[in-house]
Amino acid sequence: MANQAESSDSKGTKKDFSTAILEKKKAANRLVVDEAINDDNSVVSLHPDTMEKLQLFRGDTILIKGKKRKDTVCIALADETCDEPKIRMNKVVRSNLRVRLGDVISVHQCPDVKYGNRVHILPLDDTIEGVSGNIFDAYLKPYFLEAYRPVRKGDLFLVRGGMRSIEFKVIETDPAEYCVVAPDTEIFCEGEPIKREDEERLDEVGYDDVGGVRKQMAQIRELVELPLRHPQLFKSIGVKPPKGILLYGPPGSGKTLIARAVANETGAFFFCINGPEIMSKLAGESESNLRKAFEEAEKNAPSIIFIDEIDSIAPKREKTHGEVERRIVSQLLTLMDGLKSRAHVIVMGATNRPNSIDPALRRFGRFDREIDIGVPDEIGRLEVLRIHTKNMKLAEDVDLERVSKDTHGYVGADLAALCTEAALQCIREKMDVIDLDDEEIDAEILNSMAVSNDHFQTALGNSNPSALRETVVEVPNVSWEDIGGLENVKRELQETVQYPVEHPEKFEKFGMSPSKGVLFYGPPGCGKTLLAKAIANECQANFISIKGPELLTMWFGESEANVREIFDKARQSAPCVLFFDELDSIATQRGNSVGDAGGAADRVLNQLLTEMDGMNAKKTVFIIGATNRPDIIDPALLRPGRLDQLIYIPLPDEESRYQIFKSCLRKSPVAKDVDLRALAKYTQGFSGADITEICQRSCKYAIRENIEKDIEKERKRAESPEAMEEDEEEIAEIKAGHFEESMKYARRSVSDADIRKYQAFAQTLQQSRGFGSEFRFPDAPTGTTGAFPGAAATVGGVDPFATSGGAADDDDLYS
């Protein structure tokens, strides 16, 4: 029933059915794992009703199937206190089944268990260190004498005896894979103890270890598991099962991991070909290596051939100059066509450059399905974080949901790196109590370590998504407090950038796509770049800063490719703020660039325009441009839909100047007699940068004075050591005199003529903009205006931008 609900829920498409298929079915023999009360390695307890449903009697031997194709045999006992559909098992059984508490396992009757003739059991080396005497007599004999215990080949079990417990592994059982050890069974325990390293195989990856790709996982399982496990399904319909899957996506999103997990969970033979490995200098050798790999896989069917980095061995044939590559591609094509369709061999390829693969490989019959393993969304990231932290010791305050919100654009590998970094952070804190020369580290120290939320936050500060490594941007440490004044502008920016990231549901509700771009213009030194930094910091989006001139290169077509690449990266790590500083360098009006490399600037601008229009509304990518020459920017960029908010950032007025002085001197010791208001009054027409310079200069004078005093003191002390004792320290601070001195050198960087230019530009904009300011709807009956809050709210979603923007401009122009 649940399945049906699930499938009808998810639009009833084939794929979502398959997600339903891959859900755990509700069946009587599927039980939820619970912690055992009596700690016995061979016993599981069930509720009497459950046993009745499964037609089991007390003391029956049952076969339990767990994850990663593991199963084991146990004895079933009834237990009234055990809840229904639960099964109680201890830690040893759980680890043999590779399950945790709360996982689902299936129970099957096992009538054909025989008494064993011989079993071969060996201890694990790290549990028998320092154990003297005969292990067989002390541990194994009493363990098997106290009950008839079923064992399964390959299982580990723990025997407590004397002072300690020893772990054993069942190496061989005779007659069958599982048997019951009776009193007359021979137990062999000769041989070297087993090494723990061989035991804990790390390549055991199951579906539980892959997170954030639920939809893709369903597709892959339907393409791989169904043909390998139930080929008759395809036969009965009369179609050929698919033969190839191409996984593509950014590096670190888990393509190879998925292939491993599929191979482990289906139990298929897994044959991994790493692209470059099959190359050889001898003619014909590389092709025969490929042929051998495919032959090997066909012998061991059902099998999966996984070609990692397939773009290295199957590039486009017309683009490659080497003969070998072409022959290898042709060989791969013929091999993939020649796989007999019933040979149960599936080829999986993985690449992060799907477009550099030969197109002949990407048709139906070779790689039939291409599955995009993309950057995970927030829920996906939470899954991945849970997987990576399931064995970590976390403190109570760790909020993984918060971490997954803050890691936009991270792929699985980045999240793994984040967890490692957080753990390292935890270890660093304990470094002062750890002595590296000691053989062993104190158990107390080890137990006291736990990764806390602060460690994660520090790690977040140090890491960034790998997609952005080369355009790496520090999210700047600039907050709104660092910016003096400009209240209107701040509010408008928050509406444009923060709302869509933090309240996307509101935009959906009003059916509006948020505006994508903002252009700051105004005289130099008024904080345009600073504003962009602050917005990047405040809204937790990724931030890519692009300096205009960097995009232009000497090669034809390269500059446009750079623009494309930057936008691709931004989309991959959305939500993202793209900040173009000095926009006028790449967005001048077209047609007047004479003599530069074949109009490179024009082509870059065209590329920019198409990219801005082609930005999918789904991805939250914002563009902020900053320029101090708005008059030469191509008008096509300034239309609504591209850079639709034009914000004039004027010279600061008196109040703003006071704020700027305050935020510049936040961290400096300023004497009580310095009146910042008077300074603000006096610095009419100064830009933010000029004011910062005044503060820096007065700081410099204060430092100079301080150092001179120190030198003077040293000299006096050298002359008369006694006299100096009672001299009290003077407080070092910036005094009014320093400001007065620095004001002598203060200068305005923006002339009145420049200001007039900006104001003229702003006014022309204002006129073209405020065209409908007289517009009112024809008088409606009074009733409707009362019943109009909804409409007012709708307007609120869109229109206040215009009004507040207009008002801001009015204020700013005449400030």
Curated annotation (Swiss-Prot):
Residue positions binding ATP: 249-256, 522-529
Biological processes per GO annotation: cell division; positive regulation of protein catabolic process; protein transport
Regions of compositional bias (Low complexity) in chain numbering: 780-798
Annotated InterPro entries: AAA+_ATPase, AAA_ATPase_CDC48, AAA_ATPase_domain, AAA_lid_3, Asp_de-COase-like_dom_sf, ATPase_AAA_core, ATPase_AAA_CS, Cdc48_dom2
CDD domains registered for this protein in UniProt: RecA-like_CDC48_r1-like, RecA-like_CDC48_r2-like
GO molecular function, one term: ATP hydrolysis activity
Cellular-component GO terms for this entry: cytoskeleton; cytosol; Golgi apparatus; nucleolus; nucleoplasm; phragmoplast
Highest rank taxon of the organism: Eukaryota
UniProt entry keywords in alphabetical sequence: Acetylation, ATP-binding, Cell cycle, Cell division, Cytoplasm, Cytoskeleton, Nucleotide-binding, Nucleus, Phosphoprotein, Protein transport, Repeat, Transport
Any coiled-coil regions, as ranges: none
Phosphoserine modification, residue list: S42, S720
Stretches the record annotates as Disordered: 772-815
Function: Probably functions in cell division and growth processes. Interacts with certain SNAREs as part of specialized membrane fusion events where vesicles from the same organelle fuse (homotypic fusion).
Family that this chain belongs to: Belongs to the AAA ATPase family.
Protein name: Cell division control protein 48 homolog D
Organism taxonomic ancestry: Eukaryota, Viridiplantae, Streptophyta, Embryophyta, Tracheophyta
